[in-house]
Structures are given as C-alpha cells and as structure tokens.
Amino acid sequence: MINSPRVCIQVQSVYIEAQSSPDDERYVFAYTVTIRNLGRAPVQLLGRYWLITNGHGRETEVQGEGVVGVQPHIAPGEEYQYTSGAVIETPLGTMQGHYEMIDEKGVAFTIDIPVFRLAVPTLIH
C-alpha cells in the first residue's frame, strides 16, 4: 500500500487459470486496484503508467488516459475500484507504476502504484 497526503492505493492480483495456456507461455492475471481519496478535496485520475516485468526480466511499458476507459473523479473520503488484466509469458512477474492526477485547483500530481506480484499460486509457498 502506498500513501500520499491525499491518496492511498491498494492492489490485489489473481491468476486466471481458465484463460491461461502455460504450454503457449501465456499466463493471464487480473488485478483489482482501490484508490482512496484521503484528502479534503476531490481529485481526478487522468492517466496511468505501468511497468510489467516477467520472470525473465523482460519489461513492457503501458501508458494511457484514465483506467478502464474512464477518468474518475474521487470525492473526499470516497474510493474508486476497478479490475483489469495483464498477460505475461512466465508464471511469475511484477507490475508497478503510477497514476497522473489533478486536484480541484487543477494542480497535477503523481501517485506511485506499489510493486505487486503476478504469480501462479502453486509457485508460491
């Protein structure tokens, strides 16, 4: 979990076995992000950046506007949650990144997304 003076980010990931094909080096994961506005003013998420690293150290960068097609406004004391997915070539990897946000005065700020693991459950004891 990462905290800023205004925003808290939590991420949980899960392996999607039914959509994965290990023989084809295709491992599918879903991740759910919860963004909490701990401040006293509304914020808006404008963009995202992800660094996805597979088990061989191969990195893929993904960036774009909003999340899952929206640029959510998050009121003070409220949270926004969404689920998305990632496909990597190995049974173990990581994701990390940041969100680009603005406050009610239009001041831009960046919130780091903590590193989290993408892992097939049978690999982790």
Swiss-Prot record:
Q: Which Pfam families match?
A: DUF525
- Where the record annotates domain ApaG, the positions are 1-125
Q: Which domain of life is it from?
A: Bacteria
* Gene3D superfamilies linked to this entry: ApaG domain
Q: Which GO terms describe its biological process?
A: error-free translesion synthesis
- Please name the HAMAP family in this protein's record: ApaG
PANTHER family associated with the record: F-BOX ONLY PROTEIN 3 (PTHR14289), POLYMERASE DELTA-INTERACTING PROTEIN 2 (PTHR14289:SF16)
Q: What is this protein called?
A: Protein ApaG
